[in-house]
From Swiss-Prot:
Its EC number is 5.4.2.10. This is Phosphoglucosamine mutase. PANTHER family: PHOSPHOGLUCOMUTASE (ALPHA-D-GLUCOSE-1,6-BISPHOSPHATE-DEPENDENT), PHOSPHOHEXOSE MUTASE. It catalyses: alpha-D-glucosamine 1-phosphate = D-glucosamine 6-phosphate. It comes from Clostridium botulinum (strain Kyoto / Type A2). One of its GO terms (molecular function) is phosphomannomutase activity. The keyword Isomerase applies. Belongs to the phosphohexose mutase family.
């Protein structure tokens, strides 16, 4: 059995890879491992709008109840809401059934511990080991020891909306905002929060039917929103993904504003308020060099981690930083939540736009994005580290780096899933870096022939 858990829980095609049987086992093992020693543990269960959610929820909950835990089912709700509410309700764990930005046929199961954090690799391995060993030493409960399912009646959504609203001071009156909910989990929460704060709210893709989640919509397909913002003279647009743990933005001219720009704008604002701990933002190695240059001018440090919001969060927790995130729009505000939170990000950004008295595009001029080129070089899995060993490749990387002279960079990343390495170059001249990236990729491929 290979490793069941990926970077964001267990994910696969629902009913084929992520079956009801597997969901039952994950519920049983997760509840047992996460609540050991607790008399009558409580586990919060939420999901996005996928058609397979009902099937997987039924199986997952059956597993939870079989080991004597209570399952509190809150229905369709954003992933970050489960992270927050697990803490607020003093639950012993939280589970979300969602495949985030993936197409409808996929689904996933993701656990949070009692503090609202994603699980460590060690805990995930313990859950997998229990399933692999066929629940050896797990007692079979009967009678009054079996757990109960509790259907929650909307209080959870209300509590999450109130929490998200509380993260900004004042209101959003006078702001005209377009929201794209991706026909996903934020179709109620995001719309209500913005309306209650006084914004003029226009919404697209907020009619989920079980199969239209992420379809040509949301943060992975923002084209319709870009058009809508311009056509309707909105001050800004905000696009969520299926489980609303990420958010991208659109300026009033219809330009897509990615996570790097959001981090730059929010980082500068936090510093102004004296809330940017250690004057540092945490980003990944894939963030644009333009962000580093912009932050240097603002006397803000950038610390880089491996790709993945879990690594960003690890770094933030280790050194008590206030903000971090990825280009994809996973932004973590550690003062507010324990994971990327699309609605909290959207509200911070909207509030900054309103209070600044500037247009969104003016705020975005804080940063100039450098041209970026990504080229794949095909290599076998056992030769993915050749760029670290081969002298000619190392020398070529050094030469390119020297020639870019601080206004560009080379980054090589082995793929975690395919037999290739990704060659990424950034610099001021698109044509030049294009040529250099393709040349370097070719050199790597020639060396492994």
């Amino acid at each position: 059995m290979g490793r069941m858990f990926g970077t964001d829980g267990v994910r696969g095609i629902a009913n084929k890879e992520l079956t009801a049987d597997l969901a039952y086992k994950l519920g049983k093992a997760g509840a047992f491992i996460l609540t050991e020693g607790t008399h009558r543990p409580k586990i919060l269960v939420g999901m996005d709008t996928r058609i397979s959610g009902d099937m997987l929820e039924s199986a997952l909950v059956a597993g939870i109840l079989s080991v004597g835990a209570e399952a509190i089912c809150v229905g369709v709700i954003p992933t970050p809401a489960i992270a927050y509410l697990t803490r607020k309700y003093n639950a012993d764990a939280g589970v979300v059934i969602s495949a985030s930005h993936n197409p409808v046929e996929y689904n996933g199961i993701k656990f949070f511990n009692k503090n609202g954090y994603k699980l460590s690799d060690e805990l995930e391995d313990s859950i997998q080991a229990l399933i692999r060993d066929d629940f050896k030493d797990v007692p079979v409960l009967t009678g009054e020891n079996i757990g109960r399912k509790i259907e929650e009646d909307g209080e959870a959504i209300r509590d999450y909306i109130d929490f998200a609203k509380s993260t900004i001071k004042g209101d959003l009156k006078g702001l005209k905002v377009a929201l794209d909910c991706a026909n996903g989990a934020s179709y109620i929460t995001s719309v209500e929060a913005f309306k209650e704060l006084g914004a003029e709210v226009h919404v697209i893709n907020n009619k989920p039917d079980g199969i239209n989640i992420n379809r040509n919509s949301g943060s992975t397909h923002p084209e319709d929103l870009m058009e809508y913002v311009v056509k309707n003279n909105c001050h800004m647009g905000l696009a969520f993904d299926g489980d609303a743990d990420r958010c991208l933005a659109i300026d009033e001219k219809g330009n897509l504003i990615n996570g790097d720009f959001i981090l730059a704008i929010c980082g500068k604002e936090l510093k102004k308020q004296g809330r940017l701990k250690k004057n540092t933002i945490v980003v990944t190695v894939m963030s644009n060099l333009g962000l580093d240059i912009a932050m240097k001018k603002e006397e803000i440090n950038t610390i880089k981690t491996k790709v993945g919001d879990r690594y960003v969060l690890e770094e933030m927790l280790k050194n008590d930083y206030a903000i971090g995130g990825e280009q994809s729009g996973h932004i973590i505000f550690s003062d507010y939540n324990t994971t990327g939170d699309g609605l909290v990000t959207a509200l911070q950004l909207a509030h900054i736009v309103k209070e600044s008295g500037k247009t969104f595009s003016e705020l975005c001029s804080i940063m100039k994005e450098l041209p970026q080129v990504l080229v794949n070089a095909k290599v076998s899995n056992d030769q993915k580290d050749i760029y670290l060993k081969d002298e000619e490749i190392k020398s070529e990387i050094d030469t390119i780096t020297k020639n870019l002279d601080g206004s560009g960079r080379v980054l090589i990343r082995p793929s975690g899933t395919e037999p290739l390495v990704r060659v990424m170059l950034e610099g001021e001249n698109q044509k030049e870096i294009d040529k250099l990236a393709h040349g370097l990729a070719k050199l790597i491929e020639n060396k492994v022939k």
